[in-house]
Design a protein with these regions (language model features):
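C-terminal capping/gating helix-and-loop segments adjacent to ligand/active sites or protein-protein/ligand interfaces
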Residues: 380-433
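A structural signal for short loop-to-beta-strand junctions that line the ligand-binding cleft
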Residues: 100-102, 132-171, 312-316, 391-399
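Glycine-centered hinge/linker elements that transmit conformational signals in sensory
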Residues: 191-193, 234-262
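Short, low-complexity disordered leader/linker segments with a strong preference
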Residues: 1-46, 68, 435-446
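Extracytoplasmic/periplasmic substrate-recognition and gating elements
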Residues: 176, 247, 251-257, 268, ...
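Hinge/lid segment of periplasmic solute-binding proteins
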Residues: 108-163, 216, 301-303, 373
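Extracytoplasmic/periplasmic solute-binding protein
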Residues: 146-159, 164, 185-235, 278
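Extracytoplasmic "Venus flytrap"/periplasmic binding protein-like
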Residues: 64-139, 175-182, 272, 276-280, ...
Length: 446
């Protein structure tokens, strides 16, 4: 195994640059000022959709309803492709802030970057003084708080989240007289019994290509029951219980899964599941529409990953939470906040999440008909609302999180699947990089 690379210089440089942008923007005068104003509460505001295209239609519906309620406010809608949104925000900040929107879609994956550059207003007090107080799912609120890197303030209003889901073929389970995979014992038993390699039938399919580590983390923490990503200043990723869970997970490869899983990204994995004889798939709610379209509602079910053992609290790895941010440079924060509050209201939040197939953040949407008719979404919502559920907050606030958890280590994960690297060596390598990144981040907070 190659020596672990310390990421200190690159991480420090990244964060230092972000802090420099923040100081530069704050020092600006009226031209590009980031202080903004409350404004008249009417007139025109600009909204950047952080997934323009797929979500354009639903946002235009919500904007039309908002403008009907507030005829003195006009919303200028700007669709930003999801692949460009972070760079679009960064460019606007670096140019002084004048071109930033009043309101923007903000995901937790890049929230800390915007906070570090001083681009967003905190919204904690605004939530507390509005109809949203006490109406947002607590676990989503905590995910947003953790992702922003500030223990006290929220820098976006959560609107939706995804969640890891264990999808299974109810028709195959029924034919084999197997119980639902609602425990790890049932899961591993079904994976074995539904596999017939000679007949090209498999109990499970996993993700070995792009995005593989995120799904491995889901499986590790769900099985280990470890409820925090950090133990002091060190990650729990390399805890022996997580290493053991990873060993069980990778042992499935080629034993009960197709060999092609080695290079699966999510699209290949989902297509393989929907078009073959595969019993189970671990993905998220986003693939529900594909499953229904290709398999039919009577052949598919989805449940949250099982708790580590019977009677234990469920441990869920945090998924990125989408939200709406109030930009500090806005000259009409009063009108911008009206739009955020309206979009996050029970009716609008429900409408938006029904369209995109995600979990609504507003608890007032929980009893809506569409959720009752979508059992996987209902189960995910109930698990997030369960006070016993423990959400393992991933460190999206680390500048190098995406590098460490994706491209830099995905080739090493493939080596684990192929038996060329042990699960322990992999966990140790990633943990060392995360510990160094956390130490750098903390150093720059003081």
């Amino acid at each position: 195994m190659k020596p672990t690379r310390r990421r200190t210089p690159r991480t420090a440089t990244t964060l230092a640059a972000a802090l420099t942008f923040a100081l530069t923007a704050t020092a600006c005068g009226d031209n590009g000022s980031t202080t903004g104003e409350e404004g008249p509460g009417k007139g025109t505001i600009t909204f950047w959709d952080n997934n323009g295209g797929p979500r354009t239609k639903i946002w235009k519906q919500i904007i039309a309803k908002f403008e009907d309620k507030y005829p003195d406010i006009t919303v200028k809608y700007v669709p930003i492709p999801i692949t460009n949104v972070q760079s679009k925000y960064d460019t606007a900040i670096q140019s002084g802030g004048d071109s930033l929107p009043d309101v923007g879609g903000v995901g937790t994956a890049y929230l800390a970057n915007l906070v570090a550059q001083g681009a967003l207003d905190p919204v904690t007090d605004r939530i507390d003084d509005s109809a949203l107080k006490g109406k947002l799912i607590k676990n989503m609120v905590e995910s947003v708080r953790a992702a922003g890197g500030d223990d006290k303030e929220l820098y976006s209003v959560p609107t939706s989240a995804n969640q890891g889901t264990l999808w299974y073929r109810t028709d195959l389970f029924k034919a084999a007289k197997l119980p639902a995979p609602d425990s790890w014992e049932n899961f591993y038993k079904a994976a074995d019994e539904l596999t017939d390699r000679g007949g090209n039938k498999f109990g499970f399919t996993l993700r070995g290509g792009a995005g593989s580590i995120a799904q491995a983390l889901d499986m590790m923490y769900a099985q280990s029951g470890i409820s925090s990503f950090w133990d002091g200043d060190r990650t729990t990723l390399d805890d022996p219980r997580n290493v053991a869970a990873l060993e069980k997970y990778i042992a499935l490869f080629k034993k009960v899964t197709p060999a092609a899983d080695l290079n699966n990204d999510f699209a290949k994995m989902v297509a393989q599941f929907d078009q073959g004889d595969i019993g189970m798939l671990q993905h998220n709610l986003g693939s529900y529409v594909d499953h229904i379209r290709l398999l039919g509602k009577d052949k598919i079910a989805g449940i949250p990953l099982p708790p580590s053992r019977a009677g234990a609290a469920r441990t869920i790895v945090s998924n990125p939470v989408d939200g709406l941010g109030l930009f500090k440079a806005s000259k009409n924060k009063a009108a911008a906040w009206k739009f955020i509050e309206f979009a996050a209201s029970p009716e609008m939040n429900s409408l938006w999440n029904e369209d995109v197939g995600a979990i609504p953040a507003n608890v007032g949407a929980a009893d809506d008909d569409w959720i009752a008719k979508a059992p996987p979404t209902r189960a995910a919502l109930e698990s997030l609302n369960d006070p016993r559920t423990k959400v393992v907050q991933l460190p999206y606030y680390l500048p190098d999180w995406n590098n460490i958890s994706k491209a830099d280590n995905e080739p090493s994960f493939q080596k684990v699947l192929l038996g060329r690297l042990t699960a322990k060596a992999f966990c140790d390598k990633v943990a060392n990089e995360l510990n160094a990144a956390q130490a750098d981040w903390k150093k720059h907070q003081n």
